[in-house]
């Protein structure tokens, strides 16, 4: 098996949670998002439920235009945000006080196309669009790290 070096492009956002065991149940809370909480009967189940709860609330609130607190709290338990949700959150944060129409004009796309970029249920930007957004906002939406993967040999 040969190893090939490739670059992995990803968007990563994590919120950290607390786990508290009480009466055989693991309770999960997100200090940065006090209205997001859940539980599980095992640590693994609690963290799976945390991922579902976190992403469900973030997707719902982002698609409705509700401001989202960015992660500040750090603990042992990190919960990843789905890439489409993280992208929509960071795009909205970077837009700041600019209107969607202003940014759409800079991208040379329609206002409705830009609205879809900020909606986690609809966002599906091309790499070209992401590259343009990175220039407009001077912000790296995507990171890349070299990773070794086995090269496929038939």
Task: Please give the residue ranges for each predicted region.
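A short, Lys/Arg-rich alpha-helix, primarily the initiator
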Residues: 72-97, 142
């Amino acid at each position: 098996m040969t190893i090939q070096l490739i670059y992995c492009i990803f968007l990563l956002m994590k919120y950290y949670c607390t786990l508290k065991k009480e009466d055989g149940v693991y309770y999960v809370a997100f200090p940065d998002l006090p209205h997001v909480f859940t539980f599980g009967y095992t640590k693994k189940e609690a963290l799976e439920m945390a991922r579902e709860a976190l992403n469900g609330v973030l997707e719902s609130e982002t698609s409705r235009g509700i401001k989202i607190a960015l992660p500040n709290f750090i603990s042992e338990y990190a919960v990843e945000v789905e890439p489409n949700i993280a992208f929509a959150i960071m795009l909205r944060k970077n837009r700041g006080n600019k209107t969607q129409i202003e940014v759409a004009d800079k991208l040379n796309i329609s206002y409705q196309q830009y609205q879809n970029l900020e909606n986690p249920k609809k966002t599906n930007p091309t790499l070209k669009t992401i590259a343009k957004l990175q220039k407009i906002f001077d912000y790296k939406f995507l990171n890349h790290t070299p990773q070794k993967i086995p090269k496929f040999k038939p």
